[in-house]
Amino acid sequence: MISVKDVVNYNPEEYKFKSREIPSDLLAIIIYAYMQKVKDLGSDTTLYEIGYEVGRLVSPKSYEDIKKFFEANNIGYIEIKEKDNGEVEIKVKDCIFCRTQKSEEPMCDFEAGLIAGFLESIKNKKYFVKEMYCQAQGYDACVFIAKPLHN
């Protein structure tokens, strides 16, 4: 049986974003339209779950891998800070999905799931990630808090 990972065939060492093939602004518009359609159907959870699965498939080994993935794919520039209580704070500047949008609420459910999948791959434990602040709300960055889940 072929796995999704085989189909994706992602290799971080060889992967390069081909911005000439799909301009990042066009990709952002396409993804935004998709996200809005899913939200209109009342399923923010679906976006989170899709992001989570993508994060697990990419399977980074370090925070540096996450930073490289975000930058190589023009998603944004990130800062990652571990807190004493076990939480992880992730700040995404110049977020491709919301930097040109306006919203009263945080809107980056896909990225929250993506970060949860990334952290699970790195730390070997599950996290729940919530976006606290979003560029679409007028903040200078999207800020996510990742809380470890206890079994």
Curated annotation (Swiss-Prot):
Signal peptide: none annotated. It holds the Pfam family V4R. InterPro entries: DUF2507, NO_sig/Golgi_transp_ligand-bd, V4R. Belongs to the M.jannaschii MJ0150/MJ0739/MJ0745/MJ1460/MJ1642 family. This is Uncharacterized protein MJ0739. The lineage of its organism: Archaea, Methanobacteriati, Methanobacteriota, Methanomada group, Methanococci.
